[in-house]
């Protein structure tokens, strides 16, 4: 049996890898499901005010937080306990705000997560239990009711002379802590048309989505209204069954387009640049000026019998150093990788790079939008 050359096997493997990589690069497409949302299908924010009990002396100070005391009195009175005029001394209760997101198409009886945040001067919500709390929508109606034990991500420990805090112990979560009591009606199947809202507005992407839908259905039922909206008229065979149509459409592959953009976070020095960033011909010079000041006080000691006194005289040393300036010419139409490599060759760090990119943009030599966070 003839032996297969190891060299040929390696060449074949390398060729196969190259073909796979080129195929992946050529098919930089995304599903419509990942590029756009269906207009009207969204979460709704809920909020409520409640009490957390069972805290180990880390709750609100009732004398300092009057609304906690009033809420506790009102709750006990509803349960038949009259404490009007009585002195309440407890550190185991905290007033909190409860927030959550009502999922789209949520039905009665399903559950949702909620976040519980201290409203007063409570130090720690660890070990606490949220009492029944109605959650209201923007229209004032109650859509869910929350209750349960809190899970805290942070903690706090203290002694007589020291205190340690990790994370935020005054915020906690209750997984599946709210039961949905009211549904938001949305008759999707009865809509004559549906709008797709692009997550990143772009004329080209909107046109490509409409073209992909029309090609798939074989009829012109989708049209871009603006860079962020594509309107889809429900064809006759899908009347009353828009869900089936959207299930098929959201799986279609589209190659999204995006404007050249550079995002800069000045606090952390992070710079993110898209692949379409191009730079015109420009010269870049970078030099660092360093001023150092050092103080070394000197003591002047008189002779033992001289009658003088000991004094301290300041001795300041000031030094100025400037790194050798470097000048580089960035040629017209260079890509992102070439730009980064060229600036790195000058010994430029991320924070210096931020200023250079802004200066290149001000000179009109960079073809991209710069967003500073």
UniProtKB/Swiss-Prot annotation:
Top-level taxon in the UniProt lineage: Bacteria
What span is annotated as the signal peptide, if there is one? 1-28
Q: Name one GO biological process term.
A: bacterial-type flagellum-dependent cell motility
User: Which residue ranges traverse the bilayer?
Assistant: none
Q: Name one GO cellular component term.
A: outer membrane-bounded periplasmic space
Specify where it is mainly localized: periplasm
Q: Is Aminoacyl-tRNA synthetase one of the keywords? A: no
Would you identify the family this protein belongs to, as annotated? Belongs to the FlgI family.
| UniProt function note | Assembles around the rod to form the L-ring and probably protects the motor/basal body from shearing forces during rotation.
Q: How does it assemble?
A: The basal body constitutes a major portion of the flagellar organelle and consists of four rings (L,P,S, and M) mounted on a central rod.
- By its UniProt entry, which PANTHER family does this protein fall under? FLAGELLAR P-RING PERIPLASMIC PROTEIN FLGI (PTHR30381), FLAGELLAR P-RING PROTEIN (PTHR30381:SF0)
| Protein name per UniProt | Flagellar P-ring protein
What species is this protein from?
A: Rhodopseudomonas palustris (strain TIE-1)
Which gene produces this protein?
flgI
